[in-house]
Design a protein with these regions (language model features):
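Short S/T/G/P-rich N-terminal loop/turn motif that feeds into the first structured element of a domain
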Residues: 2-106, 110-120, 134-236, 240-263
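A short mixed-secondary-structure module that forms the rim of ligand-binding clefts
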Residues: 120-128
Length: 263
């Protein structure tokens, strides 16, 4: 059985590359979020979006002002025209037997080409090189396509985002990988407090640490998350459906704040 005791990994050094998308080898005392208001960011049904999640661990010795600069500069990326939604800041908790993260960035795009343009934009490259990489010692990235996305692309203040990443055993068949995705998707039908759920295979080519299945659950607040955790039967059904295929799991909870910059 996989336990969830966070451990501290060894520090890493990072080259000045964009945080990777499917095409690249590639928070703070408060958190920030911003959404682009347009017809495409309203409620939608049965459409495709691209999820982008970056998890980082800030070095323990970093000054708070530099952490704030990191979060603010990542937040400013929400002004880019490709971004439908972006939120970033410190995580509530990380559950993992092997990894520990302090900050999260979550954003959404209409297509992989939009994500590609975001990743190669000079504002993004500058934020990563000058404000992100100098203050962190670990990073993991997950991008995936949600083909059956429904609801709002915006995740409102007060919501809780739960990111779950799975590292699969080697040698699994395509049918087995598909079953893992389908088992996770079925959670939305079984558990009413999940407002939104997307899941898919990680299309990133680097900085994945071998985690190839990613999902995001959106909840109305901490009360909904606590209610989910109390529903052991439904959760155990999901765990039983994937346990034999999984080597490692990372679960990160994050509270979406109001869209204010850190000072």
């Amino acid at each position: 059985m996989i336990s969830f005791n966070p451990v501290v990994a060894r520090p890493h050094s990072f080259s000045a590359k964009p945080i990777c998308s499917a095409f690249h080898t590639t928070g703070a005392t408060a958190a920030t979020t911003r959404r682009r208001f347009s017809p495409t960011s309203a409620n939608v049904s049965a459409k495709q979006i691209v999820e982008h999640v970056v998890l980082v661990r800030v070095k323990t010795e970093v000054e708070h002002s530099k952490i704030n600069d990191m979060v603010n500069n990542l937040y400013n990326l929400s002004s880019l025209p490709q971004v439908l939604h972006l939120t970033t800041g410190p995580v509530l908790r990380t559950q993992s037997p092997t990894l520990s993260f302090t900050h999260l960035l979550h954003s959404r795009y209409e297509s992989t080409s939009d994500l590609e343009e975001y990743n190669t934009h000079p504002l993004h490259l500058s934020a990563v090189k000058n404000f992100l990489f100098p203050v962190i010692d670990d990073i993991m990235v997950a991008d995936w396509i949600a083909d059956d996305f429904a609801g709002s692309v915006e995740v409102g203040p007060g919501s809780i985002i739960r990111v779950k990443l799975l590292k699969l055993k080697e040698g699994l068949s395509e049918n087995e990988r598909t079953e893992i995705v389908d088992v996770t998707k079925r959670l939305k039908q079984k558990i009413s407090m999940i407002d939104q759920l997307t899941v898919g295979e990680n299309i990133v080519q680097a900085r994945t640490k071998g985690f190839s299945i990613a999902s995001i659950g959106v909840f109305g607040g901490l009360g909904a998350v606590h209610a989910l955790d109390a529903q052991s039967a439904a959760l155990n059904d999901q765990k039983d459906g994937v346990r034999g295929f999984v080597d490692d799991i990372v679960v990160v909870d994050y509270a979406v704040p109001a869209n204010t910059l850190i000072k």
